[in-house]
């Protein structure tokens, strides 16, 4: 949510930020509605003052025994009361319209974000690891002999339809091991607090984390109004909604392993084979709630946490900073980490690490109390995948595949797999 005062003070800067995203100028529309709202509030306050003045005069007229004046003033008070109520209702309606308009306007990109139209204009900032050289044509994850029978899309389609998968046996265990490894690393080495959070949330939680009102079609809603979380960013971030947190308690760093649900609206025909794009998937999320002065440094720290998971697993990756035209609605700056996927001979996104600045905090009214006793200020919130578990499974399987259909698994998973680091061509751990 944008600060209306900042738009009033510098509408040109507001429009320039929208232009960098490829959006049309909106300051004139916003300020026109804001001015109408403020004028109606002022008119209501003036009418209220007139009502109060007339109400006080009633007593004096009654004391004087001036019955005619008493009746006139009483009628005036009744008229003013109705006028005030009508004006207040109009002001409330205008305020709701202004809030709705602001809620649909994307965050302003940071100054250092590269300008661009789409993913082709993203800028690579890091590349790690050597892409494996195979003496055979590498297969996609669902084609590898040791995986094929354990990754059951046919049964999933019978149960739920397209874009679902049933994992069985050793592959299901590897998937679980990856999630456990991620959470343990974030807690034991990166200092995050593990949270077991709900995956059903209220409208307010989706709104506060900028998923509503614009992106409701991308998520699933139950018949009684709850939303299935598209990411655990929603419950973790919204946990501080309405709070005023002591500065000394910052930063707050959370991690959670949850199911996530997305309708994938607009993705028809994309990644229809395999596990890359699913309606239901698992993700280990990182959320940081910090002082504004430390948010840029915190984003770098979170990025390092996500990259570190891939490095421990030995998965080659590259990191890109998204251009203005490819950033998410609520992001101020986003880094994508893309893992090497040999079966497609390319890098695929496995994590996004974003700072929203105070964009979400304003929607949630989440603030902190400065140590010097000053007025409460809005927090900064950040979120990042650490990592998408299914996509990490894909990267592990494809990068570790062997010519005989077996898969060599990363050493980092040994504690979670009983020391067995080979998935045989028959689909067993050995």
UniProtKB/Swiss-Prot annotation:
It comes from Ruegeria sp. (strain TM1040) (Silicibacter sp.). GO terms for molecular function: ATP binding; serine-tRNA ligase activity. Its main location: cytoplasm. CDD domains: SerRS_core. PANTHER family: SERINE--TRNA LIGASE (PTHR43697:SF1), SERYL-TRNA SYNTHETASE (PTHR43697). Pfam families: Seryl_tRNA_N (PF02403), tRNA-synt_2b (PF00587). One of its GO terms (cellular component) is cytoplasm. One of its GO terms (biological process) is seryl-tRNA aminoacylation. ATP binds at residues 262-264, 349-352. L-serine binds at residues 231-233, 285, 385. The keyword Ligase applies. It is found in: Cytoplasm. Its EC number is 6.1.1.11. This is Serine--tRNA ligase. Consists of two distinct domains, a catalytic core and a N-terminal extension that is involved in tRNA binding. Keywords: Aminoacyl-tRNA synthetase, ATP-binding, Cytoplasm, Ligase, Nucleotide-binding, Protein biosynthesis. The gene is serS. Belongs to the class-II aminoacyl-tRNA synthetase family. Type-1 seryl-tRNA synthetase subfamily. It catalyses: tRNA(Ser) + L-serine + ATP = L-seryl-tRNA(Ser) + AMP + diphosphate + H(+); tRNA(Sec) + L-serine + ATP = L-seryl-tRNA(Sec) + AMP + diphosphate + H(+).
């Amino acid at each position: 949510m944008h600060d209306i005062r900042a738009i009033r003070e510098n509408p040109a800067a507001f429009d320039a930020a929208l232009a960098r995203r490829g959006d049309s100028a909106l300051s004139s529309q916003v300020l026109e509605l804001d001015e109408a709202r403020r004028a109606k509030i002022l008119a209501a306050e003036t009418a209220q003052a007139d009502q109060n003045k007339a109400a006080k005069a009633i007593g004096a007229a009654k004391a004087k025994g001036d019955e005619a004046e008493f009746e006139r003033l009483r009628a005036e008070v009744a008229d003013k009361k109705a006028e005030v109520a009508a004006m207040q209702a109009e002001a409330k309606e205008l305020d709701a319209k202004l809030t709705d308009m602001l809620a649909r306007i994307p965050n302003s990109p940071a100054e250092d974000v590269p300008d661009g139209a789409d993913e082709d204009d993203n800028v690579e900032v890091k590349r790690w690891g050597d892409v494996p050289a195979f003496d055979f044509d590498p297969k996609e994850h669902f084609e590898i002999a040791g995986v094929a029978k354990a990754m059951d899309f046919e049964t999933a389609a019978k149960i739920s339809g397209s874009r679902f998968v049933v994992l069985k046996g050793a592959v299901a265990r590897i998937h679980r091991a990856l999630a456990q490894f991620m959470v343990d690393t974030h807690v034991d080495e990166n200092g995050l607090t593990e949270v077991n959070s709900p995956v059903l949330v209220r409208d307010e939680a989706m709104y506060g984390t900028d998923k509503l009102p614009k992106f409701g079609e991308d998520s699933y809603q139950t018949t009684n109004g709850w939303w299935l979380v598209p990411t655990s960013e929603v419950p973790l971030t919204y946990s501080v909604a309405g709070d005023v947190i002591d500065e000394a308690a910052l930063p707050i760093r959370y991690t959670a392993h949850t199911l996530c649900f997305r309708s994938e609206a607009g993705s028809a025909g994309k990644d229809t084979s395999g596990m890359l794009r699913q309606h239901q998937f698992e993700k280990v999320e990182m959320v940081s709630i910090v002082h504004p002065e430390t948010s840029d440094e915190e984003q770098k720290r979170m990025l390092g946490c996500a990259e570190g998971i891939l490095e421990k697993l030995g998965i080659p990756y590259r990191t890109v900073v998204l251009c203005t035209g490819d950033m998410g609605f609520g992001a101020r700056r986003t880094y994508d980490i893309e893992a090497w996927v040999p079966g497609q001979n390319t890098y695929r996104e496995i994590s996004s690490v974003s700072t929203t600045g105070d964009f979400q905090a304003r929607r949630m009214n989440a603030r902190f109390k400065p140590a010097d006793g000053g007025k409460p200020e809005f927090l900064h919130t950040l979120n990042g995948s650490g990592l998408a578990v299914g996509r990490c499974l894909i990267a592990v399987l494809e990068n570790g595949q062997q010519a005989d259909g077996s898969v060599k698994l990363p050493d980092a998973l040994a504690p979670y797999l009983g020391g067995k680091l080979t998935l045989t061509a028959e689909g067993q751990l050995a």
